[in-house]
Structure formats: C-alpha cells, structure tokens
Design a protein with these regions (language model features):
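Short active-site oxyanion
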Residues: 30-34, 68-70, 109-111
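A generic structural signal for short hydrophobic patches within well-formed alpha-helices
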Residues: 10-11, 41, 120-121
C-alpha cells in the first residue's frame, strides 16, 4: 500500500519541539512506499525555512531527493480537479496545497494519508462522496 505524506507530518518530523515529532518519525520510518507532491515539497520547505532555519529546509529537501518519498508533480488536470474540489466544498477552508493533494491522491488511487491536518479527514471522494481517506499518524 502507498501512503501520501502531507506537510504537517514532514514538518513535525523535522521539528523536535513539535508535539507530533515522534509519531511523524514513526510514520516516515515505516516500510510503506511514501508519496508526496511537488506542492507539498515547496510548502514544507518554506515552513521549515521560516519557522526553524534554512538548514532544516535543505535537509528535508535533500532527504526527498535521496528517495525518501516519490515526488509526484501536480499537473494541469490536478489543478482543475483542485478547483472543482473548492467549488464542491465551499463550506470548507481547504488550502490550495491540500486540494491539489486530494486531486493527486485520487488520480494515483492512494487512499491512505499521513497527516495531522483535519482537512484530510473531512474530505470525501468517489461516487456521492462516500469514501474517506484512511488517516495514518
């Protein structure tokens, strides 16, 4: 099974003072194939850069470059799907990165998400929006 990793888990694993640090590290050290998007990479790098230090951001990126996770590019079709998600969930404040993550996960058939972000638990997909992601972490 594949596991999509959200910014919240990448960040928590890099920040030793984060309350989710141990859980995040445990998830990332599992034997499951990990996936993330280029948008999550940029969002995480930016958070690490400004909240911790540039060195933390570079270590994170270096880890991804070394194969820690498959980095899936967000394409034009994913952006359109993300737009449609926004239209369908007007009552939610999903970020653009979350919406593109949902779109990529659906495209790749990934139903498991490592996230501390409640939006991943709220989002529903499939016919009549009956399916939810399995949240790990």
């Amino acid at each position: 099974m594949s596991l999509f990793v959200d910014t919240s888990v990448w960040y928590a694993a890099a920040d030793s003072s984060d309350t989710g640090n141990a859980r995040a590290k445990a998830v990332l050290n599992s034997d499951e194939p990990l996936f993330t998007t280029d948008h999550v990479l940029v969002e995480t790098w930016t958070l690490l850069r400004y909240r911790i230090h540039r060195h933390a951001a570079e270590r994170f990126w270096e880890g991804l470059r070394s194969g820690t996770s498959t980095i899936e590019p967000v394409g034009t079709a994913d952006l359109e799907a993300a737009w449609q998600i926004g239209l369908s969930y007007r009552d939610q404040d999903f970020s653009l990165v979350d919406r593109t993550s949902f779109a990529v996960m659906q495209r790749l058939g990934i139903e498991r998400a490592a996230s501390f972000d409640d939006d991943f638990a709220v989002f529903r997909f499939g016919p009549r929006r009956r399916h939810a992601f399995v949240i790990v972490g």
